[in-house]
């Protein structure tokens, strides 16, 4: 099945969108998930969007076992969580404080990953990008591969058990 969203679309409080195996969402505008709404992409599910924004906070904003491609920016607002066991490709990921990313497969960025204060990153897969910027009170744990052209860390706790390159 394929769902084409022609413009900016907001998923209101309490909505969970589940993209099943071999299903696809094509969004030409911004997909916004508000409050406790969620996006779950199952294995072999696919979402393509211009922009995607999670304003909901807890519980998990995005759970991905499939493929998520964002042409511009994926935004995680305060309290949002991203669990990735699939593939995420985006120009940038914009993150507010008090958010969390757990990556168990692959995240590829054309631009930057900016880790604000009170942010937690657990990488058990692969993360590639142009620039990694981390600020005070951010915690990054790398158990596999992180490769960026530039890495800038300011008062950041980094637990590196594998390969972190700039």
Name the predicted role of every residue range:
Residues 1-166:
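Extracellular beta-strand-rich, repetitive "passenger/adhesive" scaffolds
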């Amino acid at each position: 099945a394929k769902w084409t969203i022609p413009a900016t679309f907001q998923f209101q409080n309490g909505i969970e969108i589940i993209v099943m195996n071999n299903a696809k969402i094509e969004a030409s505008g911004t997909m916004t998930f508000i409050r406790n709404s969620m996006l779950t992409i199952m294995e072999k599910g696919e979402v393509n969007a211009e922009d995607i924004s999670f304003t909901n906070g807890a519980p998990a904003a995005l759970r991905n076992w499939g493929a998520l491609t964002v042409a511009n920016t994926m935004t995680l607002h305060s309290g949002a969580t991203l669990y990735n066991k699939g593939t995420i490709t985006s120009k940038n990921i914009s993150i507010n404080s008090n958010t969390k990313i757990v990556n168990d497969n692959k995240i590829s960025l054309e631009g930057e990953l900016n880790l604000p204060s009170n942010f937690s990153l657990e990488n058990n897969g692969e993360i590639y990008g142009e620039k990694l910027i981390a600020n005070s009170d951010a915690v990054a744990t790398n158990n596999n591969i992180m490769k960026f052209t530039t890495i800038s860390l300011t008062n950041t706790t980094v637990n590196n058990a594998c390969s972190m390159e700039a």
